[in-house]
Amino acid sequence: MKEITITKREEGQRFDKFLIKYLPGASSGFLHKMLRKKNIKLNGKKAEGREKLTAGDLIQIFFSDETLEKFQNPQSGRDDSYEADSSMGNHKSDRGFGQSGRNRQPDREQAKVYTKDRAGNGGQERKLTKEEREFRKQVRVLYSSEDILVFHKPAGMLSQRAKASDDSLNDYLIDYCIQTGIISKEELAGFRPSIANRLDRNTSGIVLAGISIKGLQRLASMLRERTLGKYYLCLVEGKVKEDARIAGYLTKEEKNNKVSLHKEKAEGASYIETEYRVLKSTDKASLLKIRLITGKSHQIRGHLASVGHPVFGDYKYGNRDFNNQIKWKDGVNYQLLHSYELV
């Protein structure tokens, strides 16, 4: 039998959602069946799964240690058969529930990737390579509270993994939380801190992360309702003469991860709106302050390129010969686009 006491970071989520994360090898139907049979209890009582968890709640799971281990660490497929504790007899289900040290940097010699896959399932933790440890030194914690962390992401780092072997800011977040005592490895089974907004790999700047259910919910609400102003700085090709607010429609080609802009609405297109102010301008380059009205993938890069002012260093949407020139002459290895303010 396993007992789990809900912490402040885990409170606010539904009981069944917690169980799905805690026992990723079990189906939702199986977990609901265990709730009905009282093989899983909340505060010593039968529960339905819809209950909102609060700090101090006690969860009791009446599984054998072997069964618990199997459901927590599924190795190959899902298996909903299990051995209950001897006091309960044997059952087989049908399938179906388809702050201290916070400013301290993690010990990079011991740093590991603790995240699994992008959905939080499967995978194995692994040690970081020397190159990954060195690159992580560029990450900075800009702000911390009980529920939220704010990071500076360097250009060249993924926000989230694209494949299992990648390192990312989300991986760094988990490692940072473990190394600084914000959360333990054991607690990751019930709640995983996560970034709330993403930047393109080669864009630097501010990324928000929730380190509690409350924090993640609050950030998600602000981003969804667009109550958070997102501002960027970028250096673009050519002379931009005046401030402007531009609009259009965007489609994305998943195969080559590239967007196209349209003046009129096209099939599958999303409406986008971008505002910019000219901070400084010469005949060859302009420094712009960008405000994202909408927030679609590659919006700034694609939108500015569509009006003749691609971002410096942006090979996907800009001029390759020009970007090669500034790369070798000025050392510009990434697109000069930076998320610098969230208000």
State where each predicted segment sits.
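RNA pseudouridine synthases
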Residues: 1-255, 267-270
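Short, P/G- and charge-enriched loop/turn segments at secondary-structure junctions
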Residues: 127, 137-138, 259-266, 326-331
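A sequence-level detector of short linear motifs
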Residues: 48, 260-261, 299
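Long C-terminal interaction/binding lobes of large macromolecular proteins
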Residues: 276
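Acidic/polar residues at beta-strand termini and the immediately following turn/coil
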Residues: 253-254, 262, 314
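Oxyanion-binding "anion nests"
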Residues: 273
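Pseudouridine synthase
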Residues: 18, 166-173, 213, 283-342
